[in-house]
Amino acid sequence: MTEVAGMGRSTRWLCNSLRHLLYLAVIAVACHGAARGQSPADVQAARETELPGLRLVGVRDVDYHLGTLGIRIGYVEQDVRPGSGHYFCGALTLDRSATAAEPVAAALTRLPYLSVRKLGLRYVILCGGAKAGDRPIGGIPVPPLDLLMLDVGASGNAAFLQAVTLHELYHMAEVRFNTLYDADWGREFTGYSNGYAPDLLKGAMGSGKPGFLNAYAETFPHEDRAELFAALLLKPGDVLTQIRATRDSVLRRKVLYVDQKSERLLALKLAPDGL
Protein backbone atom coordinates (compact mmCIF):
# COMPACT_ATOMS: atom_id res chain seq x y z
CA MET A 1 0.00 0.00 0.00
CA THR A 2 1.31 3.43 -0.82
CA GLU A 3 0.04 6.99 -0.82
CA VAL A 4 -2.06 7.31 -3.96
CA ALA A 5 -4.77 9.95 -3.76
CA GLY A 6 -3.29 13.22 -5.04
CA MET A 7 0.09 11.57 -5.38
CA GLY A 8 1.49 14.16 -7.75
CA ARG A 9 0.43 16.98 -5.47
CA SER A 10 1.60 15.17 -2.35
CA THR A 11 4.98 14.44 -3.88
CA ARG A 12 5.42 18.11 -4.75
CA TRP A 13 4.44 19.06 -1.21
CA LEU A 14 6.96 16.62 0.14
CA CYS A 15 9.82 17.85 -2.00
CA ASN A 16 9.09 21.57 -1.63
CA SER A 17 8.32 21.39 2.07
CA LEU A 18 11.46 19.45 2.80
CA ARG A 19 13.59 21.94 0.93
CA HIS A 20 12.01 24.85 2.76
CA LEU A 21 11.64 23.42 6.26
CA LEU A 22 14.74 21.25 6.52
CA TYR A 23 17.32 23.53 4.95
CA LEU A 24 18.82 24.73 8.22
CA ALA A 25 18.62 21.27 9.71
CA VAL A 26 20.55 19.78 6.81
CA ILE A 27 23.20 22.45 7.18
CA ALA A 28 23.42 21.50 10.84
CA VAL A 29 23.88 17.87 9.87
CA ALA A 30 26.73 18.81 7.57
CA CYS A 31 28.40 20.87 10.27
CA HIS A 32 27.88 18.62 13.26
CA GLY A 33 27.45 15.14 11.80
CA ALA A 34 30.90 14.02 12.86
CA ALA A 35 30.19 15.03 16.44
CA ARG A 36 27.04 12.89 16.39
CA GLY A 37 28.88 9.92 14.95
CA GLN A 38 27.77 10.30 11.34
CA SER A 39 30.26 9.36 8.67
CA PRO A 40 30.96 11.68 5.73
CA ALA A 41 28.83 9.34 3.60
CA ASP A 42 25.96 9.68 6.10
CA VAL A 43 26.22 13.46 5.97
CA GLN A 44 26.17 13.48 2.17
CA ALA A 45 23.16 11.15 2.12
CA ALA A 46 21.33 13.33 4.66
CA ARG A 47 21.95 16.36 2.47
CA GLU A 48 20.79 14.65 -0.72
CA THR A 49 17.66 13.13 0.82
CA GLU A 50 16.94 16.18 2.99
CA LEU A 51 16.52 13.90 6.01
CA PRO A 52 18.64 15.16 8.94
CA GLY A 53 20.21 12.43 11.00
CA LEU A 54 20.04 9.83 8.25
CA ARG A 55 22.44 6.93 8.61
CA LEU A 56 23.47 4.46 5.94
CA VAL A 57 23.50 0.76 6.64
CA GLY A 58 25.75 -1.77 4.95
CA VAL A 59 24.53 -5.16 3.80
CA ARG A 60 27.06 -7.96 3.87
CA ASP A 61 27.48 -9.93 0.65
CA VAL A 62 25.46 -7.55 -1.54
CA ASP A 63 27.08 -4.16 -0.86
CA TYR A 64 29.14 -4.40 -4.06
CA HIS A 65 26.09 -5.30 -6.15
CA LEU A 66 24.06 -2.46 -4.64
CA GLY A 67 26.97 -0.13 -5.30
CA THR A 68 27.02 -1.07 -8.98
CA LEU A 69 23.29 -0.24 -9.08
CA GLY A 70 23.95 3.10 -7.40
CA ILE A 71 21.55 2.40 -4.50
CA ARG A 72 22.19 3.17 -0.83
CA ILE A 73 20.06 1.91 2.06
CA GLY A 74 19.57 4.12 5.11
CA TYR A 75 17.48 4.60 8.23
CA VAL A 76 16.61 7.33 10.72
CA GLU A 77 17.25 7.08 14.45
CA GLN A 78 14.42 9.47 15.29
CA ASP A 79 10.92 9.76 13.83
CA VAL A 80 10.70 12.19 10.93
CA ARG A 81 7.60 13.87 9.51
CA PRO A 82 8.44 15.22 6.06
CA GLY A 83 5.98 16.99 3.78
CA SER A 84 4.93 19.55 6.43
CA GLY A 85 4.02 16.67 8.69
CA HIS A 86 1.79 14.89 6.16
CA TYR A 87 4.09 11.85 6.05
CA PHE A 88 5.68 9.82 8.81
CA CYS A 89 8.77 7.59 8.80
CA GLY A 90 9.44 5.91 12.12
CA ALA A 91 12.81 5.47 13.78
CA LEU A 92 14.79 2.24 13.73
CA THR A 93 17.70 0.89 15.71
CA LEU A 94 20.92 -0.08 13.98
CA ASP A 95 20.30 -3.77 14.69
CA ARG A 96 16.75 -3.70 13.33
CA SER A 97 17.78 -1.74 10.24
CA ALA A 98 20.64 -4.16 9.54
CA THR A 99 18.29 -7.13 9.82
CA ALA A 100 15.66 -5.58 7.56
CA ALA A 101 18.22 -4.31 5.06
CA GLU A 102 19.25 -7.83 4.02
CA PRO A 103 15.95 -8.93 2.39
CA VAL A 104 15.37 -5.41 1.07
CA ALA A 105 18.78 -5.48 -0.60
CA ALA A 106 18.14 -8.98 -1.94
CA ALA A 107 14.98 -7.68 -3.61
CA LEU A 108 16.73 -4.62 -5.05
CA THR A 109 19.46 -6.74 -6.63
CA ARG A 110 16.85 -8.57 -8.71
CA LEU A 111 16.64 -5.43 -10.84
CA PRO A 112 19.16 -4.97 -13.64
CA TYR A 113 21.25 -1.83 -13.87
CA LEU A 114 19.27 -0.34 -16.76
CA SER A 115 15.97 -0.70 -14.90
CA VAL A 116 17.38 1.05 -11.83
CA ARG A 117 18.74 3.86 -14.00
CA LYS A 118 15.35 4.34 -15.65
CA LEU A 119 13.62 4.28 -12.28
CA GLY A 120 16.09 6.82 -10.92
CA LEU A 121 16.32 5.19 -7.51
CA ARG A 122 19.30 6.19 -5.37
CA TYR A 123 18.15 5.80 -1.78
CA VAL A 124 15.87 3.40 0.08
CA ILE A 125 15.07 4.65 3.57
CA LEU A 126 13.91 2.01 6.04
CA CYS A 127 11.13 3.15 8.37
CA GLY A 128 9.76 1.68 11.57
CA GLY A 129 6.26 2.38 10.31
CA ALA A 130 5.19 4.74 7.52
CA LYS A 131 2.05 6.85 7.30
CA ALA A 132 0.27 9.31 5.05
CA GLY A 133 -1.72 11.41 7.47
CA ASP A 134 -3.02 8.87 9.97
CA ARG A 135 -3.17 5.99 7.47
CA PRO A 136 -0.46 3.32 7.59
CA ILE A 137 1.12 2.77 4.18
CA GLY A 138 3.77 0.47 2.78
CA GLY A 139 5.98 3.13 1.28
CA ILE A 140 6.45 6.76 0.34
CA PRO A 141 7.85 7.22 -3.19
CA VAL A 142 9.63 10.56 -3.66
CA PRO A 143 10.79 10.64 -7.30
CA PRO A 144 12.08 14.26 -7.16
CA LEU A 145 14.63 13.15 -4.55
CA ASP A 146 15.23 9.71 -6.12
CA LEU A 147 14.25 7.94 -2.92
CA LEU A 148 11.76 5.50 -1.52
CA MET A 149 10.80 5.40 2.14
CA LEU A 150 9.86 1.83 2.98
CA ASP A 151 7.97 0.52 6.01
CA VAL A 152 9.84 -2.49 7.35
CA GLY A 153 7.84 -2.37 10.59
CA ALA A 154 8.38 -5.18 13.03
CA SER A 155 8.23 -7.92 10.43
CA GLY A 156 11.07 -10.40 10.48
CA ASN A 157 9.71 -12.30 7.49
CA ALA A 158 12.37 -11.98 4.80
CA ALA A 159 10.08 -13.15 1.98
CA PHE A 160 7.45 -10.59 2.98
CA LEU A 161 9.99 -7.74 3.03
CA GLN A 162 11.30 -8.70 -0.40
CA ALA A 163 7.77 -8.66 -1.81
CA VAL A 164 6.93 -5.33 -0.15
CA THR A 165 10.12 -3.77 -1.51
CA LEU A 166 9.37 -4.71 -5.12
CA HIS A 167 5.68 -3.84 -4.74
CA GLU A 168 6.55 -0.32 -3.57
CA LEU A 169 9.23 0.08 -6.24
CA TYR A 170 6.60 -0.56 -8.88
CA HIS A 171 4.44 2.16 -7.34
CA MET A 172 7.46 4.47 -7.58
CA ALA A 173 7.88 3.62 -11.26
CA GLU A 174 4.25 4.43 -12.03
CA VAL A 175 4.46 7.68 -10.07
CA ARG A 176 7.74 8.60 -11.79
CA PHE A 177 6.26 8.11 -15.25
CA ASN A 178 2.80 9.45 -14.37
CA THR A 179 1.01 6.17 -15.15
CA LEU A 180 -0.44 5.37 -11.73
CA TYR A 181 -3.92 5.98 -13.13
CA ASP A 182 -3.84 3.72 -16.17
CA ALA A 183 -6.85 4.34 -18.41
CA ASP A 184 -6.05 1.44 -20.75
CA TRP A 185 -5.93 -0.97 -17.82
CA GLY A 186 -9.20 0.44 -16.50
CA ARG A 187 -10.95 -0.23 -19.80
CA GLU A 188 -9.75 -3.83 -19.87
CA PHE A 189 -9.93 -4.94 -16.23
CA THR A 190 -12.64 -4.37 -13.62
CA GLY A 191 -13.94 -5.86 -10.37
CA TYR A 192 -12.03 -3.77 -7.80
CA SER A 193 -13.36 -2.91 -4.36
CA ASN A 194 -11.62 0.51 -4.38
CA GLY A 195 -10.96 0.21 -0.68
CA TYR A 196 -8.72 -1.60 1.80
CA ALA A 197 -11.28 -3.87 3.47
CA PRO A 198 -9.78 -6.10 6.19
CA ASP A 199 -10.81 -9.30 4.41
CA LEU A 200 -8.77 -8.24 1.36
CA LEU A 201 -5.50 -7.70 3.22
CA LYS A 202 -4.20 -11.13 2.24
CA GLY A 203 -1.22 -11.62 -0.05
CA ALA A 204 -1.10 -15.38 -0.49
CA MET A 205 -1.38 -16.54 -4.09
CA GLY A 206 -4.82 -17.94 -4.78
CA SER A 207 -6.51 -16.02 -1.95
CA GLY A 208 -8.38 -13.75 -4.36
CA LYS A 209 -11.29 -14.24 -6.70
CA PRO A 210 -10.80 -15.32 -10.34
CA GLY A 211 -8.79 -12.82 -12.35
CA PHE A 212 -6.66 -11.77 -9.37
CA LEU A 213 -3.34 -13.08 -8.10
CA ASN A 214 -4.44 -12.69 -4.48
CA ALA A 215 -7.04 -10.92 -2.36
CA TYR A 216 -4.95 -7.76 -1.92
CA ALA A 217 -4.88 -7.31 -5.69
CA GLU A 218 -8.65 -6.77 -5.57
CA THR A 219 -8.31 -3.47 -3.67
CA PHE A 220 -7.24 -1.06 -6.44
CA PRO A 221 -5.89 -1.38 -9.99
CA HIS A 222 -2.48 0.04 -9.05
CA GLU A 223 -2.20 -2.50 -6.21
CA ASP A 224 -3.10 -5.31 -8.62
CA ARG A 225 -0.27 -4.33 -10.95
CA ALA A 226 2.23 -3.91 -8.10
CA GLU A 227 1.38 -7.35 -6.71
CA LEU A 228 1.91 -8.89 -10.14
CA PHE A 229 5.22 -7.06 -10.62
CA ALA A 230 6.63 -8.30 -7.31
CA ALA A 231 5.42 -11.86 -7.82
CA LEU A 232 6.77 -12.06 -11.36
CA LEU A 233 10.22 -11.05 -10.11
CA LEU A 234 10.20 -13.29 -7.04
CA LYS A 235 8.09 -16.32 -7.99
CA PRO A 236 7.42 -16.39 -11.73
CA GLY A 237 7.00 -20.16 -11.69
CA ASP A 238 4.30 -19.96 -9.02
CA VAL A 239 2.40 -17.35 -11.04
CA LEU A 240 2.55 -19.58 -14.11
CA THR A 241 1.40 -22.58 -12.08
CA GLN A 242 -1.60 -20.66 -10.73
CA ILE A 243 -2.65 -19.53 -14.21
CA ARG A 244 -2.35 -23.03 -15.62
CA ALA A 245 -4.12 -24.69 -12.69
CA THR A 246 -7.07 -22.30 -12.82
CA ARG A 247 -7.04 -21.66 -16.58
CA ASP A 248 -7.49 -18.01 -15.65
CA SER A 249 -7.42 -16.10 -18.94
CA VAL A 250 -7.97 -12.74 -17.23
CA LEU A 251 -4.97 -13.20 -14.94
CA ARG A 252 -2.91 -14.27 -17.94
CA ARG A 253 -3.85 -11.06 -19.78
CA LYS A 254 -2.92 -9.03 -16.72
CA VAL A 255 0.50 -10.67 -16.57
CA LEU A 256 1.11 -9.88 -20.23
CA TYR A 257 -0.03 -6.28 -19.69
CA VAL A 258 2.30 -5.77 -16.71
CA ASP A 259 5.11 -7.42 -18.67
CA GLN A 260 4.65 -5.00 -21.57
CA LYS A 261 4.31 -1.99 -19.30
CA SER A 262 7.39 -2.96 -17.30
CA GLU A 263 9.38 -3.34 -20.49
CA ARG A 264 8.22 0.07 -21.65
CA LEU A 265 8.93 1.88 -18.38
CA LEU A 266 11.92 -0.05 -17.03
CA ALA A 267 13.29 -2.12 -19.94
CA LEU A 268 12.42 -5.18 -17.86
CA LYS A 269 10.76 -8.34 -19.20
CA LEU A 270 8.67 -10.21 -16.64
CA ALA A 271 6.43 -12.79 -18.32
CA PRO A 272 7.58 -16.34 -17.50
CA ASP A 273 8.48 -18.69 -20.32
CA GLY A 274 5.59 -20.87 -21.37
CA LEU A 275 2.85 -18.39 -20.48
Give residue ranges: language-model regions.
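Bacterial N-terminal signal peptides that target proteins for export
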Residues: 7-22
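Non-catalytic architectural context of zinc metalloproteases
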Residues: 37-98, 126-129, 192, 197-206, ...
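Auxiliary, metal-adjacent structural segments of Zn-dependent hydrolase domains
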Residues: 84-144
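Active-site-flanking segments in enzyme catalytic domains
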Residues: 120-275
